């Protein structure tokens, strides 16, 4: 659909083989930009001081849909990290972030990566149960490993 081969391959990975989502990524450039923004935020938050994390959690929690999207994006990233820590040869979802995923995986153990993935999955479930979004975001970000 007018997409070069390299970008099509990237979109196929990011969409996880879901054609509808891949089409939305092609049609709506802001979706892809938002993903990049959230992954850049993740990278900036890992070494960030607590005050920065609290401030980010406050902003994030103001829009529940945006928060859910951010957590979903972060979950795909942390799953990639966990797979690399475990030494799995499974293809990454976030192939465009391979270098930083490898870097992070080299600094974490499997139990830490697994805990972050589990925390993100639990956060999505808790959002469905209407828990306090700000508190949820704060706990989530404070529990991330400081790298």
Where does each model-flagged region fall?
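Charged, glycine-rich active-site and insertion segments that engage polyanionic ligands
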Residues: 1-73, 77-78, 84-93, 97-147
């Amino acid at each position: 659909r007018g997409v070069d081969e390299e970008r099509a391959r990237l979109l196929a990975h990011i969409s996880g083989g879901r054609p509808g989502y891949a089409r939305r990524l092609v049609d709506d450039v802001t979706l892809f930009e938002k993903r990049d923004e959230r992954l850049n935020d993740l990278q900036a938050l890992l070494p960030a001081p607590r005050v920065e994390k609290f401030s980010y959690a406050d902003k994030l929690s103001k829009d529940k849909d945006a928060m859910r999207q951010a957590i979903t994006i972060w979950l795909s990233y942390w799953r990639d990290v966990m797979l690399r820590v475990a030494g799995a040869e499974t293809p990454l979802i976030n192939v465009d972030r391979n270098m930083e995923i490898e870097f992070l995986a080299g600094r974490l153990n499997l139990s830490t990566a697994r805990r972050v993935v589990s925390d993100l999955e639990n956060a999505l479930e808790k959002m469905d149960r209407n828990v306090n979004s700000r508190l949820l975001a704060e706990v989530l970000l404070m529990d991330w490993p400081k790298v």
